[in-house]
Amino acid sequence: TSDNTFLYENAIDELNSMLNIYNDKYLLYPVLYFYGFGNGILFKALLQNKNHQHIVVFEKELEIIKIMLHLMDFSQELKENKLIILDVNSLEFQDYYDLCSSNPFFGFSRTYFLELSSDYYEKDKEEILNLNNNLIDKFKNAILSSGNDSKDVLQGIEQLIYNLPKMITHTAYQDLLKKRENLSDTAIIVSTGPSLTKQLPILKKYANKATIISADSSYPILAKHDIKPDYVVSLERILLTSEFFNNNFGDFDKDILFITTHLTHPQTIKNLEKNNRNFMLAYRGSEFIKYLKIKNFGELSEGHSVANVAYGLAVFLRHKNIIFIGQDLAYSDDGFSHTKDYRNLNKHEGHYERDFGHFRTIAYGGVGFVESSFYWSLFRFFLEKRIYITNQSGFCNTYNCTEGGARIEGTIEKPFKEMCETLLKNNLNKNFPKIVPLSSHKQNELLLKCYYKIIKSINHCKTFKKELLKSYNHIQESFSNLNLISNLDEGKEILNYLIQEIDKTKFKLEDEKMLDLYEILNPILTQFELNLARIYVLNPKTSEDSYNKSLLWVKEHIEFFKMIYTHIKAQEKALIKNITPLENELTQRNLEKYKRKINAKYNF
């Protein structure tokens, strides 16, 4: 190598040792990860095993790769992506995201480990630890983004059904985008990070020259300082968020459009209605909404923070410049989580001490580090993903003018005052076109359509529960009978039959007719398959090992089907419980006869 050290002490012995280990423990692993290319012979040998779909190699000394690729032909492996070589020095956010969120890498993320191809690479200890931590973090983020909490999903479905009449009888998100795109060059997104306070005087001075998009938590702060936003965006489904609207600012609210999600807490709507605020509900990332087919009311940008949604709105309205302020995504030097005007500051007491040292990230400006949190790190991940996509389009510049907190990759870091002076020369005509609700006739049509779909889904829950229970009882009974069988071959035959029966049931779960249940089932399906991968890669050495692996496989699926049944039952109850506002709306509109026809069709 360039530093006159050897890649191997004894190449043949080390190769044989590694092959013995991998052919023993990791024979069935679809994906293997290595740091260091070495002489490449190990990868050539491992890829003879058809179970290994991909070998991912991270290397920082590209000269080694050039030499070895010259000596050995890997053209076919590289062409088929069986061998993936990544330069450690140039890895970016998108590289990690593409790897960790796509299959089979994502599907086998819980079997991930990083191995050194030889002892030579131990000298890169710091880079290896950093790489390993990045991969683990990105796999975690990918899992979280796919959904991991069924209770959250159920709450979202409940509140969606409850809120449907309010959504349909208010303005549609797509109408907003059509009527107001290209009306403003610059949008300023206001969040409640610790750095916001110092930016408020500048924001007030330039508020009439740009579109102001406020997070719900920033709205009371802006009202206090008499800075009127054009849009206030709310994302959370919890009751606490509704308190941001439990106030009366009188004429200040005139011409502000409040945008909240389909799954917002009903109290948020009550607080908005109480003072006659102009609001709309828009959906985001909802499989049940896709089932209802009301496309005109979405789709808000994906992501786990209100800043993501606000940024998506700014992009969809075709702003050429988007500026973040108060988007710290980190604690201040004195340990504060938010600006000191933030109404829920006391809810975050002790969080700085809890998170200290665990989520440290690069500071704004690229010098030093700041303390972040798990959720801020997650928010930043999705925001950076969205910014990357926007940057690829080339029509918009994204500026981080927070002047504090964490660095957000993909943004241009500039002082807020400088960007206002550069971009905001003239007043903006804020007499934006009015967005009106759909006609009464169209509303009636959508209300009835949604009612029909919900009743149909309730019926689907009932019928599929029965079908699933029948399959479950059959599999459970056959599985229990294994205790009465002493012959291994006979037991294996029964297990193979049960695995086929399991596959038939799982195939039904993937049918497009299950669209109304995708949302409630997706979190447990994802988590189950990720955990199942750990069983899949077990390498049985004996007939007993093979039998026990199949036994474990069937046992896990029996428990899984019980969970599926419970979740479908929960959705059925949620739909029945929360359909009342929609029923009342239909009654008020003299649509009772259509409601009765739908109920009769499905015996509801």
Predicted regions and their residues:
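N-terminal donor/sugar-recognition subdomains of glycan-related enzymes
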Residues: 1-187, 194-211, 220-224, 231, ...
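Catalytic or ion-translocation cores adjacent to nucleophile or general acid/base/metal-coordination motifs
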Residues: 209-219, 224-271, 283-285, 292, ...
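Active-site/ligand-binding-proximal alpha/beta "capping" segment
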Residues: 266-325, 329
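Catalytic cores of enzyme domains
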Residues: 301, 310-388, 395, 401-417
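A short glycine-rich beta-strand->turn/loop micro-motif centered on a GG-aromatic cluster
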Residues: 58-61, 215-217, 325-328
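Proline-aspartate-enriched helix->loop->beta-strand connector
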Residues: 52, 229, 319-322
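Alpha-helix capping and helix-loop boundary segments enriched in small/acidic/polar residues
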Residues: 190, 206-209, 213, 235, ...
